């Protein structure tokens, strides 16, 4: 073969699966991030970067159970043989290097300077939507009942009827072609053409109306002087996730924000989450305000009513009996009453000691001692009722 006949190209063979390795590793890492988020939800939901965000941004949150990906050199260079349990995947850590012959020092904590290395953690970029999907999956308003309906809400449109006339945009091509084929076949010519006016089929729609039961949540928070920065942060963290949960899963839920010290007043959402106050504590004032709102604005015949009160439990002792009486009065008009107490050091609570005598099954309480308890309080108050679904 002469030089003029030599091909001007070469054929090479390559393992193209290697080109996907970077993509596969990235996908595996994202799966591990999602798994870490799910396993660390109780700690993540109270991250300040999330609670103080506008709820729409992607935020960076620390995930301490996930190492940042990087290339590691094996200084121990020995060959190891081991046996797994059968469910490991590529990239999983199956063992830790135990060399060194002595117990490893942990990272220091508390006061004073230490000589041990700190604990590294991975900062993952997570959208609020991702956290919501993992958090809200098993939550619902308890004891939700069908109430008097003011108006029906259009749920969706169904094309469930066929007619011979209609809008050209709604023509049913398949039925039109079948009709033409049958008519032509009866005349001895099995063909889709020609199509006559009598072959035309149009889809028509009906609006499916879904009656929707209304609900109102009364968010009540103690803003007195005994509620320190940590107590207010915990209460606001709970109400932050509560409002997002309600607005994500329910279309017709009103939320009223009530702040109190010795007096109670209805405030805006912005004031509720940002404004600080001081003074003494008379919790009965907030229950009176809640009853006033129900009587003037939210009839129990038309609304499912859910009051939630958060406090540190430090109430005027002489006011406790009045509080119990008002809570019992509220429960007669409400689907459920929730009381959350922020009590980090397990100190004596005048309010909780009175509420423990309430035996009504619609009264729920939760004592929050650490940040992770915001997650558990949400799970406790909004747990799914397996036997009770709204008809």
UniProtKB/Swiss-Prot annotation:
Biased composition (Basic and acidic residues): 21-31
Disordered: annotated span: 1-31, 80-117
Compositional bias ranges of the Gly residues kind: 98-115
Any matching Pfam family: DUF444
Extent of Polar residues compositional bias: 1-16
InterPro entries: Spore_YhbH (IPR014230), UPF0229 (IPR006698)
Superkingdom of origin: Bacteria
Entry similarity comment: Belongs to the UPF0229 family.
HAMAP family: UPF0229
Protein name per the record: UPF0229 protein BCG9842_B4751
């Amino acid at each position: 073969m002469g030089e003029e006949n030599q091909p001007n190209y070469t054929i090479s063979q390559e393992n193209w699966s290697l080109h996907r390795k970077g993509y596969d590793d990235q996908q595996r890492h994202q799966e591990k991030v999602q798994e870490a988020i799910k396993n660390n939800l109780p700690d993540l939901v109270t991250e300040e970067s999330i609670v103080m965000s506008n709820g729409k941004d992607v935020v960076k949150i620390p995930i301490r159970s996930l190492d940042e990906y990087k290339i590691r050199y094996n200084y121990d260079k020995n060959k190891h043989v081991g046996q797994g349990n059968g469910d490991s995947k590529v990239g999983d850590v199956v063992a830790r290097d135990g060399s060194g012959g002595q117990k490893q020092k942990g990272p220091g904590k508390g006061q004073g300077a230490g000589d041990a290395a700190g604990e590294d953690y991975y900062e993952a970029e997570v959208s609020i939507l991702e956290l919501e999907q993992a958090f809200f999956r098993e939550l619902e308003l308890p004891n939700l009942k069908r109430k008097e309906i003011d108006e029906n809400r259009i749920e969706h449109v169904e094309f469930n009827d066929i007619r011979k006339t209609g809008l050209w945009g709604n023509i049913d091509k398949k039925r039109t072609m079948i009709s033409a084929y049958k008519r032509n076949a009866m005349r001895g010519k099995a063909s889709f053409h020609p199509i006559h006016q009598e072959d035309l089929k149009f889809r028509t729609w009906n609006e499916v109306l879904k009656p929707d039961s209304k609900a109102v949540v009364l968010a009540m928070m103690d803003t007195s002087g005994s509620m320190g920065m940590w107590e207010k942060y915990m209460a606001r963290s709970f109400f932050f996730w509560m409002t997002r949960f309600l607005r994500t899963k329910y279309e017709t839920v009103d939320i009223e924000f009530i702040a109190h010290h010795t007096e109670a007043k209805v405030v805006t959402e912005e004031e509720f989450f940002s404004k600080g106050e001081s003074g003494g504590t008379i919790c009965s004032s907030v229950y009176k305000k809640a009853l006033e709102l129900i009587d003037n604005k939210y009839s129990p015949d038309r609304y499912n009513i859910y009051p939630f009160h958060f406090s540190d439990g430090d109430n005027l002792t002489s006011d406790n009996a009045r509080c119990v009486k008002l809570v019992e009065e509220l429960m007669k008009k409400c689907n459920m009453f929730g009381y959350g107490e922020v009590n980090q050091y397990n100190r004596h609570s005048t309010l909780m000691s009175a509420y423990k005598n309430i035996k009504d099954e619609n009264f729920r309480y939760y004592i929050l001692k650490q940040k992770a308890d915001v997650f558990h309080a949400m799970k406790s108050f909004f747990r799914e009722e397996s036997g009770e679904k709204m008809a």
